[in-house]
């Protein structure tokens, strides 16, 4: 092993250790449910839009056992770190997948049909669109079992068939779990159900860049495995999609823009639909620790707008029949939605007026997929004085922080996190006690 490889592996190991320390503390103080979860997280229907979803339709997140990767210290920004876990036995928790799916079926008119808010061309092609997911990976045997997965998929397929609906179902999973599924005896049982659900398999991917994906985000995913899963899905006639993150620590905002843009281009070349995930700031995560110490900042609203503009321009080049070109995760993020997002971030450069304009147009585009709204928004914010401040910030970042080698930046942040972690946890405990006293 070369010194560079050894340094890389050492950074991965140390980052995982920091993440585990934060998550163990969180699990120790988190609410432990005395029963299995009876219904999934599915957000609310606000201003004609399903919240906490990937688009103008509901997303059902059915937590069972915690995600293995969370417990192992992977996925540093983890959105689901604060999802309560159950105190019941493992087998009872596994069964909650079926219980929560039954809740969806019993309330189908209200939370599936009632949460449809498409305004684009696909509105007339699909009667219902929804996303179906666990905390981490639906095909993970640590989170669900073959028998509960089969039962849950069968229940959904039967309900849709009974109602004579044309579905589009987004299913979230980890690449390696999905590869295990493809080579297992479960495949012959589940695959026909996936076809009945008109499934799009959504992989956690985050970035096409190895350093960004596996060192900053800590995804622990090889490009070889990802491309293998995509190739198999293509041969099977199942559309693949992939999540792309846009809030990496240790990077300048120009670097984030370029990283996401290059990743969108890579996915599009493989005919994989990109799902843009804007960052929020979950407590007890490495990004939150670095943010509290002034060593990380959320992307500016103008950066978010530029990321989508680039995504839209690239994905328009390759049309996908009867599918979305792209999806955009909830701008405020959850569950549970954290207190801080890139719109209310106190360190953002964009003024409150431009921030509001950007937020409104991104919300509208999520629902309508009408990217022509971009030009209206860009015109409204182009002459504001914060535009010049934003450009100056990008230049300043690139000339100072951006001149350092990326590995050096990451190493400095991890070293700081190791030293600061105890103080951060003490700060969080003090903050939570103060909040309890105010109740």
Label each residue range with its predicted role.
Residues 98-115, 119, 149-158, 184-191, ...:
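Generic structural signal for well-ordered alpha-helices
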């Amino acid at each position: 092993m070369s010194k560079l490889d050894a340094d890389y592996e050492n950074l991965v190991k140390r980052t995982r250790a920091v993440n585990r320390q934060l998550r163990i503390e969180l699990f120790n103080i988190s609410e432990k449910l005395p029963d299995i979860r009876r219904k999934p997280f599915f957000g609310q229907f606000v201003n004609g839009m399903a919240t906490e979803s990937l688009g103008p339709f509901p997303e059902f997140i059915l937590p069972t056992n915690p995600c293995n990767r969370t417990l192992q210290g992977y996925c540093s920004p983890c959105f689901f770190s604060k999802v309560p876990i159950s105190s019941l036995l493992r087998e009872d928790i596994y069964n909650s997948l079926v219980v929560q799916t039954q809740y969806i079926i019993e309330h189908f008119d209200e939370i599936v049909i009632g949460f449809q808010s498409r305004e684009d061309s696909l509105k007339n092609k699909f009667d219902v669109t929804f996303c179906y997911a666990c905390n981490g990976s639906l095909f993970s045997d640590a989170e669900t079992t073959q028998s509960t997965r089969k039962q849950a998929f069968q229940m959904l397929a039967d309900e849709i068939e009974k109602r004579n609906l044309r579905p589009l179902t987004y299913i979230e999973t980890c690449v390696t779990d999905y590869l295990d599924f493809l080579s297992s005896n479960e495949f012959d049982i589940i695959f026909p159900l996936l076809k009945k659900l008109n499934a799009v398999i959504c992989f956690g991917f985050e970035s096409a860049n190895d350093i960004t994906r596996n060192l900053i985000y800590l995804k622990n995913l090889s490009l070889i495995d990802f491309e293998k899963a995509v190739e198999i899905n293509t041969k099977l006639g199942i559309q693949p999609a992939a999540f792309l993150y846009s809030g990496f620590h240790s990077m300048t905002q120009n670097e984030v823009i370029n990283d996401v843009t290059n990743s969108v281009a890579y996915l599009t070349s493989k005919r994989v639909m990109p799902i843009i995930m804007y960052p929020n700031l979950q407590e007890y995560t490495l990004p939150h620790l670095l943010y509290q110490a002034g060593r990380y900042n959320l992307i500016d609203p103008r950066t978010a707008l530029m990321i989508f503009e680039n995504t839209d321009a690239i994905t328009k080049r390759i049309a996908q029949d009867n599918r979305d070109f792209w999806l955009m995760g909830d701008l405020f993020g959850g569950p549970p939605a954290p207190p801080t997002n890139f719109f209310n971030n106190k360190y953002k450069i964009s003024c409150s007026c431009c921030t509001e304009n950007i937020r409104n147009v991104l919300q509208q585009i999520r629902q309508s997929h009408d990217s022509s709204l971009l030009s209206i928004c860009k015109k409204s914010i182009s002459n504001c004085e914060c535009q010049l401040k934003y450009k100056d910030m990008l230049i300043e970042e690139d000339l100072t922080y951006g001149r350092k080698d990326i590995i050096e930046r990451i190493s400095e942040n991890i070293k700081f996190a190791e030293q600061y972690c105890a103080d951060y946890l003490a700060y969080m405990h003090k903050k939570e006690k103060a909040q309890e006293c105010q109740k």
